[in-house]
């Protein structure tokens, strides 16, 4: 067999063995994708015994390309919600998540200095202790540029030694917080639900009868504060006739308007217009329909809603717009993106015409456009290679192959589309790309680390590494957990999701979800902190590597 054939065969064997190990669960907890690392270590131990040598350059390429695929697909997945998570309700959760990341970084620096732990070892322990594989890749890259030798093998070993307690430590932290604070799970779930209902700001509807005599005879656009209030006037009922109004529709006293918007804004408009009306303005039994359509026509990507002139040409109103799972109030200045779901109100024939304009080709939502993927990866690699020179640093700071594609993917996913290129990826395709990338990366890391892993693990040095990893895992979680619970008054279920998200650990999230079956509190906080934490976990080891290298 050729060298390439041998490497591909061994990688396949590592993936099969590692994924099987990852599926083994003890009381519902397993290694997950981390099992691939241990599969690589086992196969590497065997190849070392039989004297099989693998081409280092080929392995290095596979490792780096796998990392690029993984972080890029992560960025595309979380990009639409990344910037939103930094606002309002997400600030508190992200603040505590940053606290966990920051404390772990401080502990790394202290352990490195106090116990004279080699930099590659402590960075590998750090990545394993926080169960974050991209941070391992980021640390390996920057240390290689700094001139370190045998980086991959040493960091891979220390990562693997610290990884198991990285998972166990999160679960232990959740359990201790629950015991110490005597948490009542049912009560916590009820309090969370009550709080969510009070804070919920989704779109609401309201029927208002025009009783203000000063507005009779005015056009819709002449209503006081018409432009300043983000309200959609989707239907108007006059006597028994239902019409779709536009800005030039003349209002009569007694008209019933169907409004869509946020509850507080609807209340303000009711005070201006008149009184709430208990009248049905349903399209049933009329010539009008209310239907959903998805934007898939590349000719309308980036076009503002007002440029389509749907009201003027077709008497169709967009009453709601759903983008990446978030309901938005459409306005004329809003640009359409691929995958936007529009709620259309109008005559059936007009709606069909609008469908043809915006596309509404659901099969396109399942198709993967390959060109934008490679455009994004290429731009990410270029960004990651750009040097940022800081006085006093021995090397230029770079985002690297882990940070560059991540940042570009976050930005492109937020933008959505440029011309005919769109960065929407079906969830199944994104998951497949992400899993392939991480399996390739971990397989190679395991193959490089496995030769001396067992000897290191059983040595006093290996036991010390496990201890350092336990400290880096446990102390930030338990300290932040106590602070969030005592001073932040955080709900326990949300706290469990926060701890899981701060360690970017899906097995821990699965455990947190099982604390209260069918409850979404943990998953919600996990999703809120995950994007920012993933970014910080990739940047932090690079900063630590440069700062500690400079200080030594």
Curated annotation (Swiss-Prot):
GO BP terms: potassium ion transport
Main location: membrane
Top-level taxon of origin: Bacteria
Keyword Transmembrane helix: yes
Membrane topology label: Multi-pass membrane protein
UniProt-listed Pfam families: Asp-Al_Ex, TrkA_C
Domain (RCK C-terminal) ranges: 190-275, 277-360
Subcellular location field: Cell membrane
Listed GO CC annotations: plasma membrane
InterPro entries: AAE_transporter, RCK_C, RCK_C_sf, Transpt_YidE_put, YidE_YbjL
SUPFAM superfamilies: TrkA C-terminal domain-like
Residues annotated as transmembrane: 4-24, 29-49, 65-85, 95-115, 161-181, 370-390, 402-424, 438-458, 463-483, 492-512, 529-549
GO molecular function annotations of the record: monoatomic cation transmembrane transporter activity
HAMAP family with a match to the protein in the record: YidE
Family note: Belongs to the AAE transporter (TC 2.A.81) family. YidE subfamily.
NCBIfam families documented for this protein: PRK03818.1 (NF003007), YidE_YbjL_dupl (TIGR01625)
Name the UniProt record assigns to this protein: Putative transport protein APP7_1021
